[in-house]
Amino acid sequence: MENWVELKKGAKVLQNNKNNKILIVTHIDTDGLTSRAILQKLAERLNLDADFMFLKQITIETINDIPFKDYDLIIFADLGSGQLKMIKEKLDELNLSDKRDKIIILDHHQPEEIKIPKTIIHINPLTIAKSGAEICGAGVSYLFAKAINNDWIDLAKYAVLGAVGDIQNIEGKLIGLNRKILCDAIMNGDVKVKTDLQMYGRQTRPLFVSMRYWADVRTDLLNNDSKIIKYIQSINKKYDIEINPTMRLAEIPFEHKRIIGNELLIKCLNYVPNHWTPYIPKVIFGEVYEFRGEEFGSPLRDLEEFSTCINACSRYGDYETALNVLMGDRDKYYRKMLSNLRKHRNNLREALEHVKNDVEIIQKDRFQYFETDKIMSNIVGIVAGMSYSIEEVDWMKPIFAITEDENGYKVSARCPKLLCFAEDVNLAKAIKYASEKVNGSGGGHKFACGAYIPDNKREFIKYLEIALR
């Protein structure tokens, strides 16, 4: 990234602070954890005097937990761009506004529109006319590390995992800056790229289970194991092949998966509007990414499954387990991660049953929503996405889930990938507009985002209707 001035400047400032006290603050999702892994490796290699801190988000409350005065340099990764004004005001309040290059922000989220003060080095792809959808926070952290030492391509694998965890392969493959980072990870022998069916659980689930939960197009196969098995048997008969529905996707020959994909494409044509049909192939086939160094059949081999394992820890505050597994532990912490994963899946199952049996899905013209105080706010977004498997949920509309949080309400929004492709729905823009109208804050991605609102649920819904017209 020869022309990325702020990236070069940030790398130089870090090297100038090698003997000073440094604090590195990262977000808590897969992108945040992989950013932390990259920056922790960087700190070890440069022998920095660095402390680390995880932060769920920067708010008026949590910014007071950041010890700005105790450190010469503070680095934020996968957060900070959306809170530039708040960070600037806190530095002013603490009489630190004369400290040049006090803060480095490594982020990819939409920045606040303010004049960047001399105290902050803001490294974000959007400032160089790149998209925040083609590189994640870990990707920016990786390029930052590479600006210090161009040979550190062994760190690229973390950035690829961060990108997959942030669903930046939504178009069926990683693009733009992510593609260049992926090439580094491939060159270093860490990541393998394949074309495969876009179904979750390639390494760990039987084929029929992966098909059971595939909801990018709602067909008669969803949640119907007997129908899925009969469907596979009919494919076997039609093509004179033998696909075992209990085999994992990773075990099935590509030629057989290509046949399944083609048959699924034909089936899906009966379930979508005509103008959606050109986009169906993108949700059936695409690139998948594996870590070569992980065992075949391990939930850590497929990067989507690895990301779920991280979420099963970090969403419940167990950052230590996720980080240690990322850094290479396959003993004590890996066993703890698998235990966390079982609990996480059980929580999701119970929450989905609650939505199915006890919650009213309220339909609006352009979206739908539900309210509950029975689902943990840390998983409500995942549950919102999973709710498309429920018959009462209209799979052709976005869904918003509203649950109580410490200081008001958390709102999580999801929509099917096809809706983003065919109708150009942008939930992030809508939720940001509606939340700010009621003195809250929100943002994220076109297809998955969230917000915090103090109260005014009814007003928030009203502004959502305006935003999604």
From Swiss-Prot:
Protein's name in the database: Single-stranded-DNA-specific exonuclease RecJ
Class in the EC hierarchy, top level: hydrolase
The UniProt record lists the keyword Hydrolase: yes
Annotated family: Belongs to the RecJ family.
Pfam families, alphabetized: DHH, DHHA1
Annotated organism of origin: Methanocaldococcus jannaschii (strain ATCC 43067 / DSM 2661 / JAL-1 / JCM 10045 / NBRC 100440) (Methanococcus jannaschii)
Domain of life: Archaea
Physiological role: Single-stranded-DNA-specific exonuclease.
EC number assigned by the record: 3.1.-.-
PANTHER family according to UniProt: SINGLE-STRANDED-DNA-SPECIFIC EXONUCLEASE RECJ
Alphabetical UniProt keywords: Exonuclease, Hydrolase, Nuclease
A GO BP entry: DNA recombination
GO molecular function, one term: nucleic acid binding
Cited InterPro entries: DDH_dom (IPR001667), DHH_sf (IPR038763), DHHA1_dom (IPR003156), RecJ_exonuclease (IPR053584), SSDNA_exonuclease_RecJ (IPR051673)
Keyword Nuclease among record annotations: yes
